[in-house]
Curated annotation (Swiss-Prot):
UniProt source species: Aspergillus fumigatus (strain ATCC MYA-4609 / CBS 101355 / FGSC A1100 / Af293)
Family as reported in the entry's similarity comment: Belongs to the PAM17 family.
A GO BP annotation: protein import into mitochondrial matrix
Assembly, per entry: Component of the PAM complex, at least composed of mtHsp70, MGE1/mgeA, tim44, PAM16/pamP, PAM17/pamQ and PAM18/pamR.
InterPro entries found in the cross-reference section: Pam17
Name of this protein: Presequence translocated-associated motor subunit pam17, mitochondrial
Transit peptide segment: 1-49
Gene that specifies this protein: pam17
Protein location: Mitochondrion inner membrane
Alphabetical UniProt keywords: Membrane, Mitochondrion, Mitochondrion inner membrane, Protein transport, Transit peptide, Translocation, Transmembrane, Transmembrane helix, Transport
Amino acid sequence: MHLTLMNGTLRTAALSGRFALASPSPLPTATPLFQCCQKMSLRTQARPVSTSTTRILLKPSLRPQTSSMCLSPIFRKTAFRLNSTAANASRAEVPKLDWNSFFKLRASRRRYTLASSIIASMASTIIGVQILSEQDLESLGAQVMGLDPFVVLGLATATCGAVGWLAGPFLGNAIWRLVYRKYKPAFLMREKEFFDRIKRFRVDPSSNSIANPVPDYYGEKIGSVQGYRQWLKDQRAYNRKRRSFII
């Protein structure tokens, strides 16, 4: 009887001791190992959040670039249209020039250049004489060329006049372009076409002679449409004489 009671008490004590050993003990949260593991876990959890935020921040920055890339062809098209309209307007403003008007303008340019050559030669001669009169021509002629002072003065005066005559066409051409600047583009186009025709239809000057001279090789005497037709007839007559050996 007493033995059975003792066995029961021993069994209960053993069972209670096992259950006490099997129950989990609380982890020490204040240890440094636990704190280190906790920090590592927090870092691993914070990484995807940071990447997601960077992605979210990068997405809006790409939108203005795509919009600018899409809008750039539109601006290019509008700029091209504006340039094309301006070019068409400038072409429409250029006046048309027929051949008779071209020859009239060509003759007026020749008159401008001739008048400017005369005026420039006179001005350069007067200025040159005034400058030379102040110089010692006797010693200059004797030292340099050994000539008489009057001969040196005459040569210097002629040189001054020649310089003015050669500079006159440049001055006259500039004045003519300023006066007729409205017809300048059309005139230049007609002039290019005119010289192309002259180069195409003029004769070969290799067989030139006294009996059969070359008729106006550069077309300088042409002053109208009738003059151009006469020039073509002269070129054909020269070729006929050259072929028939009437030289």
